[in-house]
Amino acid sequence: MKKLLLLFMLFSNVTFAQMAITHFNAEWNSANDVLWVMDLEDCKTISYSDIAKDTESQVKHKIAVVPTIIIFKDGEEVARFQADLSFKMIATKEEVQDEINNQMMSDF
């Protein structure tokens, strides 16, 4: 019982990072929306931003090409995936999910 209590006390102070994803694109490039972004796991928030309508967000996050996917950990950018010159996302769902997993595991 003492060991169980000790383990509980050790891990009760562990807090997990809040992971969030923002998918930046524009209406004129909707054919290249990254549809699988909504299937990513272990993210508290997955959001979409149309940079043509939300220019403030475009400037704030320095979006130069769309689509762009940014992973935020506790509100700070930790990874960015951008489209190629043809405005198509080159990263795969697996690559983005691997980065999310790596960020989550870095807390341990």
List PLM regions with ranges.
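Local sequence-structure signature of Cys/Sec-based thiol-disulfide redox active-site neighborhoods
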Residues: 16-49
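Extracytoplasmic/periplasmic, Sec-exported soluble proteins
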Residues: 50, 61, 88-92
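Sec-dependent N-terminal signal peptides
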Residues: 4-13
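N-terminal post-signal-peptidase region of extra-cytosolic proteins
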Residues: 52-57
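Structural micro-motif
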Residues: 61-72
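Short, flexible, glycine/charge-rich loop motifs used to bind or transfer phosphoryl groups or to couple energy/partner
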Residues: 11, 36, 59-60
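Non-catalytic, surface beta->alpha helical segment in thiol-disulfide oxidoreductase systems
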Residues: 71-108
